[in-house]
Amino acid sequence: GDEKRPWECCDIAMCTRSIPPICRCVDKVDRCSDACKDCEETEDNRHVCFDTYIGDPGPTCHDD
């Protein structure tokens, strides 16, 4: 599982309960990371990456 995550970081990850989990990141970002294949523009000129990633969704973008 050395696949690059389709996002640099993720605050709102939605993952299945399977092992390993299959995750999507529903963050709205200014632009998708280079690794994202399926990047959709939102109504407010932001972007959401619709790629899925198998495994840990990685670090959050914002520390509370």
From Swiss-Prot:
Key words of the record: Disulfide bond, Protease inhibitor, Serine protease inhibitor
PROSITE patterns membership: BOWMAN_BIRK
Top-rank lineage group of the source organism: Eukaryota
Alphabetized GO MF terms: serine-type endopeptidase inhibitor activity
Pfam hit, one: Bowman-Birk_leg
Stored InterPro entries: Bowman-Birk_prot_inh, Prot_inh_BBI
Site (Reactive bond for trypsin): R17, S18
Gene Ontology CC: extracellular region
Disulfide-linked positions: C9-C61, C10-C25, C15-C23, C32-C39, C36-C49
DNA damage in keyword set: no
Recorded family membership: Belongs to the Bowman-Birk serine protease inhibitor family.
Protein's recorded name: Bowman-Birk type trypsin inhibitor TI1
